[in-house]
């Protein structure tokens, strides 16, 4: 056999069928080929591989006498660095010519077992020198370099065997030697390297000592390097407060919402950054895909002018209450307080259906409450659009909304003072309060218009409370004129192209995900190992590198000279539709337990009301005293009051409850019982200790009378009042104290 090619594999394509052979005239006894052995189990096939040198100089290793010299090695002649051609990938064979093998290469045995999932390193002199580690994935393998090999110069590479496609395998590396362990730990493999190099200055102690490290090279299919997250291994994460461990990220999120909600944002942000695969931001060489999150693709932030504005320390006077405020930020807060007071004084239906955060109006107070609980929360969910400040039921619906409505790098919220831009309204508001404090500038929270005078600012502020404002359909801003709205529409474009899209080749696909989700490599058909049920968006970048992206659904794309991003949506759940989705839990992809319970109750109640059989005649609601024409439409929804424990299915009764119980001005309360007030005239309250009497209109006076006189008691007399007579014999009575 030639010296240039001392290794001849029988089959490289299959992992378990790699068998190494070599022919040497003079071999040491321990260098002779070990015969294949087979255990009692028929499924445990053992394949033995050998790598030997062309010179018997490796036998000098046996001359070591002291165990303390574990980091020493024999001196060998310098050899040209390189990797045997058999171990090179296809790309390496094209770039570099074949090189000579490394002298005194390690000898190891590869054992493939289908019934175990451990990696073992054995030494003949130390039978207990073993280390077990869990195999991360079915499609990955672990290669441990033998710890009894000699030290090599730093420029030399250790040949490694790349194996793919093996399931439930483990490798046992054996080295029958009588000497102590002289270990060499290779450097951690980089992304751009295929074979790790040796660091001769480091050594591997025995397994019995605490600081044990093993030189492992994780080799997975399709990538040069991989991590335990790529391999699909369960990585335990602990709650920072109670130290309860979880295998998946979503159960940890659900636990932290109830255990430590104040720590969830910061703690999960660190976990996502640390667990994100290193190759997720890079284009795959084979498929040409790029994986990006919604936050990276659509959202952005631009600092604008960095020069500091001079402070004027101007005072502002409110012409409504003649109060003088020290600076502009306090005056803005004062105006917001005036707005809240005016809403409380004005008893209108809009006050109970308008969101106090984004100033949107909803048909019912229940829908408003659902919007606040799902969108304006301190926790970030993967189903919320930060530009619109709206929440969606699933991540797939969110991605469809982002594709149809927004552009990559869209920043519609602009500070008119310094041109600071952001995709979220809260960033601009926080920037204005921090950077432009103690100046003449006053920011409108409705349209972000900046004024420098108090009186025009207050007039502009109050005009937003009137009807007929022009709302932007793509964000939360609202304007007083259609001209301002048209000028604002120009901001809904790509302001800064994401850095990840720069330099992409034509035809490269970009996968947009709403969240990372639990990565599972057991689904090779899903892009980049995304979990079933995880929604993603595939975007093909334009051939020309332009900074503006156009939506393909817009018919007026000819107005812009830039090209478009053609987007197609798909879901990874189509890959594995037969498997249940019970284990995969998403933060907001599924409705909350409370909403799901209310939905089920509503569906059951609606079905029962539709199928109800009642007697003919007039039916009245005992809560609102109105006629019931259709039971299903009258009791359409189950409403729970957010201020007290009041629950009802009657929408009219809930409106009256909000007006009468949670209003600051009882004299202006709106009552829906005016049509039926005649039936309430039969109620009389009599004090049993004195001559104090009160009818149905004097209930508050009777309550005040009883509260001032602790020993007095009251009796309620209810009379049946007909339409013709106003009084009759008392029918029922009860006493109150």
UniProtKB/Swiss-Prot annotation:
Keyword terms of this UniProt record: DNA-binding, Isopeptide bond, Metal-binding, Nucleus, Phosphoprotein, Repeat, Transcription, Transcription regulation, Ubl conjugation, Zinc, Zinc-finger
SMART domains on file: ZnF_C2H2
A GO term for molecular function: DNA-binding transcription factor activity, RNA polymerase II-specific
Bias (Basic residues) ranges: 580-602
Record's signal peptide: none
C2H2-type Zn finger ranges: 316-338, 353-376, 383-406, 413-436, 470-492
Residues with the Phosphothreonine modification: 223, 540
Coiled coil start-end: none
Biased composition annotated in UniProt, kind: Polar residues: 57-66, 112-123, 176-185, 211-223, 535-579
Cross-link (Glycyl lysine isopeptide (Lys-Gly) (interchain with G-Cter in SUMO2)): 5, 10, 14, 33, 55, 75, 113, 126, 167, 174, 180, 187, 273, 522, 564, 574
Function comment: May function as a transcription factor.
Name of the protein described by the UniProt record: Zinc finger protein 280C
Organism this protein belongs to: Homo sapiens
């Amino acid at each position: 056999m030639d010296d240039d090619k001392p290794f001849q594999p029988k089959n490289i394509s299959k992992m378990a069928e790699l068998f190494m052979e070599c022919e040497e005239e003079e071999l040491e006894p321990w260098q002779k080929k070990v015969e294949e052995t087979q255990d009692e189990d028929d499924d445990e096939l053992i394949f033995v591989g050998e790598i030997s040198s062309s010179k018997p100089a490796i036998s000098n290793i046996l001359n070591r006498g002291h165990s303390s010299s574990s980091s020493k090695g024999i001196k060998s002649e310098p050899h040209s660095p390189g990797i045997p051609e058999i171990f090179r990938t296809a790309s390496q064979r094209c770039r570099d010519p074949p090189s000579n093998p490394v002298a005194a290469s390690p000898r190891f045995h590869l054992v493939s077992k289908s019934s175990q999932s451990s990696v073992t390193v054995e030494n003949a002199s130390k039978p207990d020198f073993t280390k077990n580690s869990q195999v991360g994935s079915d499609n990955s393998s672990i290669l441990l370099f033998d710890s009894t090999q000699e030290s090599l110069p730093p420029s030399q590479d250790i040949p490694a065997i790349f194996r793919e496609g093996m399931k439930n395998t483990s490798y046992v590396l054996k080295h029958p030697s009588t000497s102590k362990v002289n270990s060499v730990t290779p450097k951690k493999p980089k992304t751009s390297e295929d074979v790790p190099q040796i660091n001769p200055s480091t050594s591997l102690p025995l397994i019995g000592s605490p600081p044990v490290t093993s030189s492992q090279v994780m080799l997975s299919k399709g990538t040069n390097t991989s991590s335990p997250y790529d391999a699909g291994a369960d990585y335990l994460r602990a709650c920072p407060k109670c130290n309860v461990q979880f295998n998946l990220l979503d159960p940890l999120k659900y636990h932290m919402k109830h255990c430590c909600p104040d720590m969830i944002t910061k703690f999960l942000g660190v976990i996502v950054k640390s667990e994100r695969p290193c190759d997720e931001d890079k284009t795959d060489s084979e498929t040409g895909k790029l994986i990006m999150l919604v936050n990276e693709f659509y959202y952005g932030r631009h600092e604008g002018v960095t020069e500091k504005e001079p402070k004027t320390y101007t005072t502002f006077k409110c012409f409504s209450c003649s109060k003088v405020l020290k600076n502009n930020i306090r005056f803005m807060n004062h105006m917001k307080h005036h707005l809240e007071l005016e809403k409380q004084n004005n008893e209108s239906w809009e006050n109970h259906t308008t969101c106090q955060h984004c100033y949107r109006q909803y048909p019912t107070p229940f829908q408003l409450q659902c919007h606040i609980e799902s969108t304006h929360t301190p926790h970030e969910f993967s189903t919320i659009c930060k530009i619109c400040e709206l929440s969606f039921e699933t991540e797939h619906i969110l991605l469809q909304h982002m594709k149809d409505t927004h552009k990559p790098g869209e920043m519609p919220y602009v500070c008119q003072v310094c041109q600071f831009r952001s995709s979220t309204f809260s960033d601009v508001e926080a920037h204005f309060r921090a950077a432009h404090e103690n100046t003449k500038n006053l920011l409108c929270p409705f349209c972000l218009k900046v004024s420098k005078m108090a009186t025009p600012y207050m007039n502009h502020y109050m005009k937003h409370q009137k009807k007929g404002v022009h709302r932007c359909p793509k964000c939360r801003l609202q304007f007083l004129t259609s001209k301002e709205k048209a000028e604002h529409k120009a901001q809904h474009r790509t302001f800064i192209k994401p850095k990840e899209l720069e330099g992409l080749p034509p035809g490269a696909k970009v996968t947009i995900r709403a969240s990372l989700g639990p990565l599972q490599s057991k689904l090779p058909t899903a892009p980049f190992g995304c979990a079933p049920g995880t929604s993603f968006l595939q975007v093909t970048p334009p051939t020309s590198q332009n900074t503006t992206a156009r939506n393909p659904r817009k018919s007026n794309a000819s107005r812009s000279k830039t090209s478009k991003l053609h987007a197609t949506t798909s879901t990874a759940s189509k890959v594995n539709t037969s498997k249940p989705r019970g284990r995969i839990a998403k933060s907001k992809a599924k409705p909350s337990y409370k909403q799901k319970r209310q939905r089920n109750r509503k569906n059951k109640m609606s079905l029962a009301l539709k199928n109800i059989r009642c007697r003919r005649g007039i039916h009245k609601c005992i809560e609102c005293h109105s006629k019931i024409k259709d039971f299903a439409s009258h009791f359409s929804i189950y409403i729970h009051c957010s201020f007290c424990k009041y629950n009802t299915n009657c929408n009219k009764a809930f409106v009256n409850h909000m007006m009468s119980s949670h209003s600051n001005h009882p004299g202006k309360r709106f009552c829906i019982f005016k049509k039926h007030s005649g039936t309430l005239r039969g109620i009389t309250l009599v004090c049993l200790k004195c001559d104090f009497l009160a009818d149905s209109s004097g209930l508050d006076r009777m309550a005040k009378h009883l509260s001032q006189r602790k020993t007095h008691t009251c009796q309620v007399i209810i009379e049946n009042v007909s339409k013709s007579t106003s009084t009759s014999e008392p029918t029922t009575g009860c006493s109150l104290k």
